[in-house]
């Protein structure tokens, strides 16, 4: 981050693997603020299976569930000034007010240009990498609920059997979800 934007006063990293190292990161950066970008676990699992193949279903379910537990345990140690939860669905459906809330949390001014991230040269160079191909596009919400199309009935049943409690607690289940 510091190489691409040397003037940056705030930097971040969104690697999900960091959920395994939160206590250590907190020791190194004791004033760090944490934003949990929460997404429907079914869509997360669906995305991972699409990327890694059908054999990854078990691992994807386990990773989402384990990461969620680790984040929930860790955030209890933080003051409200150091932790914010943002729903992915809110970010893509209502990007401006959600981003304003995030900016307030991290202590920077919101600008309309932030929604034009996909036009930045640093974004353009990454959008050609398969994993980051959507960086070159404006915010879109068509990936919400994609699990219904991407996962087979058998896969959906497995996901629901293993994530129903968490999905319910987070408010992701409704009457149509059985």
Locate the predicted segments by residue.
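PAPS-dependent sulfotransferase catalytic domain
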Residues: 1-55, 65-80, 84, 162
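PAPS-dependent sulfotransferases, especially Golgi type II membrane carbohydrate sulfotransferases
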Residues: 49, 57, 68, 72-76, ...
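Acceptor-substrate binding/catalytic loop of class I
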Residues: 58-65, 92
């Amino acid at each position: 981050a510091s190489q691409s934007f040397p003037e940056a006063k705030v930097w971040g990293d969104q690697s999900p693997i960091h959920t395994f190292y939160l206590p250590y990161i907190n020791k190194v950066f004791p004033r760090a603020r944490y934003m949990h970008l929460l997404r429907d676990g079914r869509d997360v699992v669906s995305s991972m299976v699409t990327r890694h193949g059908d054999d990854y279903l078990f691992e994807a379910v386990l990773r989402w569930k384990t990461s969620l537990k680790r984040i929930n345990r860790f955030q209890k140690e933080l003051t409200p000034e150091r932790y914010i939860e943002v729903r992915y669905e809110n970010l893509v459906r209502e990007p401006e007010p959600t981003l304003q809330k995030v900016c307030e949390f991290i202590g920077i001014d919101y600008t309309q240009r932030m929604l034009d991230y996909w036009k930045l040269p640093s974004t353009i160079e990454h959008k050609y990498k398969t994993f980051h191909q959507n960086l070159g596009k404006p915010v879109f919400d068509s990936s919400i609920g994609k699990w219904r199309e991407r996962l087979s009935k058998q896969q959906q049943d497995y996901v629901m059997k293993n994530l129903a409690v968490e999905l319910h607690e987070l408010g992701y289940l409704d009457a149509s979800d059985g």
